[in-house]
């Protein structure tokens, strides 16, 4: 019998320049490039992992944060299993825009039950000392808007990056019927005997 794992689509949303591409690349490749250009449209990377005994393939989508790329990114929202709303702790405007990003996602992803959809909030760039958004402010927003989990991350030094993505998987596992996500893997039981062909008249 072929082994099965789950395929989860996870999308990163937030203003341009908050570090979405860097977070994805740090998590998947464990590399950080300070010279990354802004994403145009969308791109994605896959990562296989095991979370709490569940084998998962994460399909992580990075989206362009600039307004002029809205028509390019929004068609890819559909089918998402979790949304990582991302802001930069050194940019208060990116924090204030979280509500707009949430609304945009719910609308274009056609989320049927927004109150139960798994969002995870990331306050990125904690390696920068000059903060404009406090931990308390971010936690209060999360509590008021759906009691979402909040992680302060740094793609530069990898702080909490893995923990945030793994929490996204746990949120999906807690809310979704995994049978909708099952995919075949390459593991096959070589000792299984084939069933005899049956026929009927």
Curated annotation (Swiss-Prot):
Is Metal-binding one of the keywords UniProt gives this record?
yes
State where Mg(2+) binds: 21, 39, 62
Q: Which domain of life is it from?
A: Eukaryota
Question: Which of this chain's residues are annotated to bind GTP?
Answer: 17-22, 34, 38-39, 65, 124-125, 127, 156
Q: Which residues form a coiled coil?
A: none
Q: Give an example GO cellular component term for this record.
A: phagocytic vesicle
Which PROSITE patterns does its entry note?
RAB
Give the record's membrane topology.
Lipid-anchor
Do you know which SMART domains this protein is assigned to? RAB, RAN, RAS, RHO
Q: What class of enzyme is it?
A: hydrolase
Q: Which residues carry this modification: Phosphothreonine?
A: 187
Query: What is the regulatory mechanism acting on its activity?
Result: Regulated by guanine nucleotide exchange factors (GEFs) which promote the exchange of bound GDP for free GTP. Regulated by GTPase activating proteins (GAPs) which increase the GTP hydrolysis activity. Inhibited by GDP dissociation inhibitors (GDIs).
Provide one Gene Ontology biological process annotation. Rab protein signal transduction
Q: Which reaction does it catalyse?
A: GTP + H2O = GDP + phosphate + H(+)
Q: What broad class describes the main subcellular location of this protein?
A: membrane
Compartment(s) of residence: Cell membrane; Endoplasmic reticulum membrane; Golgi apparatus membrane; Late endosome
Give all N-acetylalanine modified positions: 2
> Covalent lipidation (S-geranylgeranyl cysteine) residues?
200-201
Give the residue ranges of motif Switch 2. Answer: 64-78
Instruction: Look up the EC number in the record and give it.
Output: 3.6.5.2
Q: What does this protein do?
A: The small GTPases Rab are key regulators of intracellular membrane trafficking, from the formation of transport vesicles to their fusion with membranes. Rabs cycle between an inactive GDP-bound form and an active GTP-bound form that is able to recruit to membranes different sets of downstream effectors directly responsible for vesicle formation, movement, tethering and fusion. RAB9A is involved in the transport of proteins between the endosomes and the trans-Golgi network (TGN).
In terms of PANTHER family, this protein maps to: RAB FAMILY (PTHR47981), RAS-RELATED PROTEIN RAB-9A (PTHR47981:SF9)
The similarity comment for this entry is: Belongs to the small GTPase superfamily. Rab family.
Quaternary data = Interacts (preferentially in its GTP-bound form) with GCC2 (via its GRIP domain). Interacts (GTP-bound form) with SGSM1; the GDP-bound form has much lower affinity for SGSM1. Interacts with SGSM2. The GTP-bound form but not the GDP-bound form interacts with HPS4 and the BLOC-3 complex (heterodimer of HPS1 and HPS4) but does not interact with HPS1 alone. Interacts (GTP-bound form) with NDE1; two RAB9A-GTP molecules lie on the opposite sides of the NDE1 homodimer; the interaction leads to RAB9A-dynein motor tethering. Interacts (GTP-bound form) with NDEL1.
Q: What is this protein called?
A: Ras-related protein Rab-9A
Gene label: Rab9a
